[in-house]
Every structure is written in C-alpha cells, then in structure tokens.
Amino acid sequence: MNTKNSNEARKYTEKDKWGYVVCFGTVLIFIAGIGHVNSFGLIYKDFIVDTHSSAKSLTTAHGVFSIMLAIGGLTLNVITKRCSLRLGGLIGAVIMSTGSFVTVFISSTNQLPFTFGVLQGVGFGMIVPVCYSTFNHYFVRKRTQVMSLIKATQGTILIFYPQLLKVLLSRYGFRSTLLLISGISLHTFPGVVAMNMSTKTNKNRTANVLTIENGTNNQETADLIDKHKDKKESQIDVATKNIKLSIFKRDVLEMLNVKILKDPVFCNICIGQSFVNFSDLIFFVLQPMLFYQYGLSTNQVAACISISAGADVAGRFGLAFISSIASINTRLLFYVATILTLAARIVILQVRQFIWLAVVTSFLGVLRAWLHVASPLVISHHVTHEDFTGAYAVFMLSTGLVNIIFSPIIGLIKDVYQDYIPAFYALTACCLPCLFLWPAEYYLKYKLNK
C-alpha cells in the first residue's frame, strides 16, 4: 500500500515538474513567434519609404493575421481528430517558420498579407491552442497564478525586444534582420516539443459518434448485407454517406458553436470587444510611424516601445494585486479601460514633446494590459465553462472579420491624406461601438425588467 502511494506521489511530482517545462515552452513560443509584432513600424519604416509601399498593406497584413489565427485554431481541431495535439502544433510551427523565412525575400509590403498574414497567422493559430490545452492539463489549482507569471515573463522580455531590433537593423540591415527573426521563429519547435501530455490521444470522435448513433442498427445492417448483398449494397452506401455527411455538418456547427450567436448579449460583447481589440492592435503597430512623423529619433521611438511594454507588465502585476484584495467586474473594467484609452489617444495626438509622449504611452500600456486580461474573462463570465472554447473561437472570428474589413480602410486613410494623424483619429473612433452599444444593452435590459 505504501509502495503504491509512493509511486503515485512520484508520478504527480514528475507531472508538476514537467508542467513548468510547459510554462517555459509557452514563453518561448510566444516570444519567438510574435515577439517582433509590436515593432513592425520600427522594422519596416525605411523599407516602406525605399519601395514606395503603402501603409494599407501593413494594416491589411495584420487584419489577415488576425482572422487566420482563428482559422488555424479550427484547422487544428480537425487535424487532432486523426493525430496527436503536439503533432498538430509541429505542423503549425512548420507553416509559421516557412512564412517567417519567405518574408525575407519580399519586394514590397504587398506580399506581407500572405507571408505574415496567411502563413504565420495559420501556423501560430495552430500552435496557441496546443499551448493552452497542455497548460490546462498540468495546472488546475494554480492556473491563474502560473498563467499570470507566464504573461509577466513574456512582457518583461518584450521590454528589451525593440532595443534588440534597433541594434540588429543598424548593424546588419533590413534583410539580415528579417533572416535573424526567421531564425528566432525556429525556437517554436522546441517549445511545441515541450507540449507533452501523459494521457493518450482520444480516438476519432466522428467514428465514435457514428458508432453510437448506429449502435442498435449495426446487426440489422449486417443482416441486410448477408441476405440482400447484391440488391441493397448501393442503398447502404448511400445511407452511410448521408449519415457521414450529417455528422460532418453537425461537427462543423459544433466547431463554430453557431448556437451561441442566438444570444444577443454575447453578440454585443463580441462586437464591442472586436472593435476595441482591432483598434488596440493597429494603434500599437502604427504608433512608431506616428512618432517618426512627429520627428522623434530611432532611439526615442525604441524607448517608447520599451516603455509601453514595461507599463504593460506593470499593469498586469497591478491588476493581479488589486484582484487579490477586491472583487472586480471584468466587463466594467473593460469598459472603463476603453473610455480611458479613448481619452489618452486623443491626448497623444495633441502633444509632440518626447517626455509627454512617453508618459501617455506608458499610460496606454497599462490600459492595454487591463484590456487584454479582461477580454477573455468577459466572455468566460457570460457563457458556461463547456461553451467557452466555442464561444471564444466565435469571438476570434469576429475580431478577425473586423480586422480584415477595417485594416485596409485605416491604411487607405493614411495613404489618401499622406498623414498618420487622420488614420489615428479613425482608430480612436473604433472604440465608440463598445462605448455606445454596451450602455444601450443595459438600458434595454433595465427597461424590459422595469
């Protein structure tokens, strides 16, 4: 008996130890995969000028990347019915690394929607669910605490990423820097290899559903084949195809969680958050370009990006501390952070001195952390635990659609006016759907309940 307990204790100890390897792999994947994304303006500024490219291609690339993340996740869901989760992640790493390497040879930013948006988007979209699924397998009680530590570690490393890119660009040039970034992306492979779960992979769920639905009819089908093999064979084939087709349709509907779209509150949450998250992403991608237009040097722009990353980390730690001593309404937090973000962006479009730009950027970094932390929690608090994965996939698709539709419009505004400021006002206005639709929802609920 004691030997059995000792073996079980050793088993769980080894599982806990490997769980921290999974944490390291998760940090490695996010840094290697998308660590450079916030520094796009720093990387491509001179390239856009030299090739006479448009800013629309840069924003479109991020729009495509956003929707391809969701498609990559759905693709992984299909692949893992026939192979292991880790193998699906490795396929994603191959696709993402290929996209990163091909980017080295682009002749204009018009190729970025494919090399970065499609290839890297689908690849990274296949890797992320592998990370979170493996993480959830190893951590249950300490999940929030450990995930906060992972995100804080990522943020701390990202503080120094713009400075590293600035050095690489000055010493090795544009193409060599892209080649080094593609080399860094190869670190996603050891990160995915670390995603090892001790449990065996489930068998093909489609086959199981087919067996369950036809369980009572299996013997009858066999009898029909034996008695009327020649006459009924074609009918059985047609029936089998119809059953498989109906199961496929149901799998697609389950995968997309279409039933959640019947919930108007969830749809309102999706619309509001999709516009805010789109606005946040494109704002920080184009922010270095705006600062260059203001006349800041490369050192000052890199410093602002690092300050924003540091403020993001501080915001996460601060929110973790506040939530440990007081209960926080995550939807209210998201709404208040959106209001403050709108105000701070208007301010940053009025000032030109480096010190004030750095101060407002740090404030925006804190608000960005609050938005990112609250975003999935708003959804998880509204839907059941069983529906969360499907609901979040629908939200990712919603965000991707907003990105792919409105990203080119933002880039077009900049190209038409030959000025980044009108484009940033348009990005700021993207906060308004959330700020107007959410209070309208509360007003209608209050009026109906009165």
What is each model feature region?
Residues 71-110:
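Conserved MFS/SLC helix-loop-helix module at the cytosolic interface between two early adjacent transmembrane helices
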Residues 72-85, 315-329, 414-415:
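Helix-to-loop junctions at the C-terminal end of transmembrane segments
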Residues 142, 149, 153-205:
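Helix-loop-helix hairpin linking two adjacent transmembrane segments in secondary transporters
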Residues 31, 99, 111-126, 151, ...:
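Hydrophobic core of transmembrane alpha-helices in multi-pass small-molecule transporters
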Residues 279, 294-300, 317-319, 323-378, ...:
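C-terminal transmembrane helical hairpin of 12-TM major facilitator-type secondary transporters
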Residues 1-15, 190-271:
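Long, low-complexity inter-transmembrane loops of multi-pass membrane transporters
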